[in-house]
Amino acid sequence: MANFGCEDLRSQDGESFLYFAYGSNLLTERIHLRNPSAVFYSVARLQDFKLDFGNPQGKTSETWHGGIATIFESPGDEVWGVVWKMNKSNLSSLDKQEGVKSGMYVPIEVTVSTQEGKEITCRSYQMTNYESVPPSPQYKKVICMGAKENGLPLEYQKKLNSIEPNDYKGKVSEEIEDIIKKGEAKTH
């Protein structure tokens, strides 16, 4: 893993960076809760990685009540996501959201390919110590909404939709419940 200071991560203005999202931050409204500078840059594919869900350090997410997304190296697999262009001023809030200080995730550099075939280096996050468990229905829904909103490939959307969630039937945080309700209203 290379150092975050790599030139490829920065846009030409030097004030922003590129972030590859593959979990709940696929959804525009979700990423904007803590990172208002995020602007859609591209749909992209991360080759030789696989999506998984887990409890970081074996602890259930108090926000999502189930496994949360991570990626791990897996030759021949791929993870689709969204590249967001973000102002460097949001880097600390993104790290905080991803639980970097508590050791939930570590920032990594990944090289992704856009649908046009352009390769770009982005910041992303990966859990290093987790127990695989299914996501809550609400978390799965937010990821699927983001995949649909941003036009991830239909086959990948089907794969996301086929993920078996856990049986959590309670509520998640109010701000997330609001996002889910707004998303459901758009599709009806």
UniProtKB/Swiss-Prot annotation:
GO molecular function, one term: gamma-glutamylcyclotransferase activity
GO process annotations (BP): release of cytochrome c from mitochondria
Quaternary context: Homodimer.
Function recorded in the entry: Catalyzes the formation of 5-oxoproline from gamma-glutamyl dipeptides and may play a significant role in glutathione homeostasis. Induces release of cytochrome c from mitochondria with resultant induction of apoptosis.
Protein EC: 4.3.2.9
Catalytic function, reaction form: an alpha-(gamma-L-glutamyl)-L-amino acid = 5-oxo-L-proline + an L-alpha-amino acid
Modified residues (Phosphoserine): S173
Gene name of the record: GGCT
Family affiliation: Belongs to the gamma-glutamylcyclotransferase family.
Gene3D superfamilies according to UniProt: Gamma-glutamyl cyclotransferase-like (3.10.490.10)
Keyword set, alphabetical order: Lyase, Phosphoprotein
UniProt key word Zinc: no
Gene Ontology CC terms: cytosol
Name under which the protein is recorded: Gamma-glutamylcyclotransferase
Disulfide bond residue pairs: none
Binding site for substrate: Y19, F20, A21, Y22
Catalytic residues (UniProt): E98 (proton acceptor)
